[in-house]
Amino acid sequence: MRKTLLIAMVILATAFTANAQDKKEESKVKQLTYKEFIKKIWNIESNPRAFSYRGSLPAVIDFYADWCGPCRRVAPIMEELAQKYEGRVLFYKVNVDQERGLASTFQVQSIPMVLFIPMEGQPSKQVGAMSKEDYIRFIEDRLLK
């Protein structure tokens, strides 16, 4: 009986772990490291003074930390927006604890901080959590006009 119970618990734990991994892979908001940022967004090393966007679509970058309550509230909103604007806007996230250099580059002093990058011109940033409707307004006004 104990052996059967143990086997059932192992199977359940494996199923939950596999399900959690599947959910992570489904994310439309892509995590950016410093190397990926240089490749996809802006090569800070070759052109540190003038922002030059390298992307093919406008972008939204969420600067966050795992321990930040407001950041955890913004994350599902970003996922919804990434689905809503799929094919029109790229969505990324940067963990400020792991990518301190990127946080410093954009003078992130308070999180969440969301960077809106248009195809042409300079990025704009919004500090603090906002409603989904406010993020939609920012995207429509600053990225898709």
Region locations from a protein language model:
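Short pre-active-site segment immediately N-terminal to redox-active cysteine/selenocysteine motifs
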Residues: 56-59, 63-67, 110
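Loop/turn elements at helix/coil->beta-strand transitions in domains of secreted/extracellular proteins
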Residues: 56-59, 87-90, 119
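Thiol-based oxidoreductase modules, predominantly thioredoxin-like and allied folds used
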Residues: 63, 74-82, 86-101, 108
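C-type cytochrome heme c attachment motif
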Residues: 66-73, 113
